[in-house]
């Protein structure tokens, strides 16, 4: 029920926006951290709706950071459409992004219709964090990292999009699972990250707008607005850092972190300082 939803105060909203911004594009799951961080501080769970709305700040950061890339992508696709050149790089990339968005839209609608929201129990978060860490580690080992962004097509987009649908499970991480899928397609790490960011644009927009409309409450506007603003600022810095990091390093630091994070949650549940 809407009446049971907790809305953060102004400084709590800024803190949660910071957590969202830092973790959204790192392969460590923003949803998981937005579930665990408040629990450690003794705050109630703000819920999936609040998390989805403040993701619009992360979306704004992506749009600004990749403004030049998006402009070239859209102009190139428009020219390809005019020429009916459907093998052109920009057209294939755009179609891959659009097709890759369909699985998470369909899965998200199904989850909403059947269960109302994805499971948010901490044991689910912990298991998903460790499970995706193992998958990402496997992708690091077997991925050949020989393809760039311009080699991607519609089939690649569908494959990564199917993986993205798993991000509805808290703890999986949208960026983590799409990065894993892209590495398994032999993409270079920085190219895989860029594709993950671009593929996330429609998903973040649709989820944020849908939840804002469905769960609209006037008393939530201040906390949502401050959380979104904070998420925007920290997301921009996170994007820039991750792109630079993956140009020179692997994802193993995130793999180790995810395993440690998952084990910490299980330990907290076992000792009682975290509640399911």
Curated annotation (Swiss-Prot):
One of its GO terms (molecular function) is undecaprenyl-diphosphatase activity. Keywords: Antibiotic resistance, Cell inner membrane, Cell membrane, Cell shape, Cell wall biogenesis/degradation, Hydrolase, Membrane, Peptidoglycan synthesis, Transmembrane, Transmembrane helix. It is a multi-pass membrane protein. The chain crosses the membrane at residues 46-66, 94-114, 122-142, 152-172, 196-216, 226-246, 253-273. It is an enzyme of class 3 (hydrolase). GO terms for cellular component: plasma membrane. The keyword Cell inner membrane applies. Catalyzes the dephosphorylation of undecaprenyl diphosphate (UPP). Confers resistance to bacitracin. This is Undecaprenyl-diphosphatase. The gene is uppP.
